[in-house]
């Protein structure tokens, strides 16, 4: 009798576990590639924000200061978008951290003479946005996690606009 009761209890417990819905985030877990994307996108945004904050104070040309303000707003927003998408895809990302090359570029900006600042800032923005564009395009095409892929695709036109604007401003002296 005890054996039959145990079997029935075990069968009931298994059925109960199978009936409990699994949260959507747990069903769509993403892996290492997603974390790398989130980390690189966050680092790129952090660099853009910090470099542009410096440009709002040091740039001589008003067009460069306006460009910097746009970058601060847009990259702050994209950081939030990527973080929300990562959470939707079941990740718990760490706060962004600058890469070594980005820290070096910020040090170069800090050390630049006032008359050289605009040129140096814009010369950094072009390759930084080329890299960012490649990152977001690639992830939008082949990345893990539907929310992160969609977000990467939404960020692409913003980065394209930044790159075009940086190229427009760069030849101006």
Predicted feature locations:
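His/Met- and acidic-residue-enriched segments that coordinate or traffic transition-metal cofactors
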Residues: 2-10, 19-173
